[in-house]
């Protein structure tokens, strides 16, 4: 991937994220644009989103993909490119895996026996 493509990917990631926050509502759910990958000719772009919260990720993706034209138009007004890529949204489940891992660690911590205070260890000498 070229340096220019990397810059376009980052610019689109920010603009798509802003558009989603401003124009869409996902009650009780956080939707984050993780990464954007455009083709070298800028005709197509894959948008990887993380979904954490009450809504099913499939519902979020369905809503975003069904309204990709609105998102593309909003991005085209703010970003000047020869072509505005046709966007397709895909799930990046790393955010949900991170939340699940934190919850698992908290559960393990609750079930571990408590360590004796540091002072109690020194009193036995």
Curated annotation (Swiss-Prot):
This is Ribosome-binding factor A. One of its GO terms (cellular component) is cytosol. Monomer. Binds 30S ribosomal subunits, but not 50S ribosomal subunits or 70S ribosomes. It holds the Pfam family RBFA. Gene3D superfamilies: 3.30.300.20. Its main location: cytoplasm. It is found in: Cytoplasm. GO terms for molecular function: ribosomal small subunit binding. One of its GO terms (biological process) is maturation of SSU-rRNA. Belongs to the RbfA family. Keywords: Cytoplasm, Ribosome biogenesis. It comes from the Bacteria. One of several proteins that assist in the late maturation steps of the functional core of the 30S ribosomal subunit. Associates with free 30S ribosomal subunits (but not with 30S subunits that are part of 70S ribosomes or polysomes). Required for efficient processing of 16S rRNA. May interact with the 5'-terminal helix region of 16S rRNA. It comes from Akkermansia muciniphila (strain ATCC BAA-835 / DSM 22959 / JCM 33894 / BCRC 81048 / CCUG 64013 / CIP 107961 / Muc).
């Amino acid at each position: 991937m070229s340096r220019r493509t990397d810059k376009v990917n980052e610019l689109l990631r920010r603009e798509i994220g802003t558009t989603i926050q401003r124009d869409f509502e996902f009650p009780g759910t956080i939707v984050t644009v993780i990464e954007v990958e455009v083709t070298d000719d800028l005709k197509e772009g894959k948008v990887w989103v993380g979904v954490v919260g009450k809504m099913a990720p499939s519902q979020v993706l369905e809503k975003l993909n069904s309204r990709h034209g609105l998102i593309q138009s909003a991005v085209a007004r703010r970003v000047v490119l020869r072509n505005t890529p046709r966007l397709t949204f895909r799930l990046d489940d790393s955010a949900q895996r991170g939340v699940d891992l934190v919850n698992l660690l908290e559960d393990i911590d609750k079930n571990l026996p408590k360590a004796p205070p540091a002072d109690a260890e020194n009193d036995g000498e």
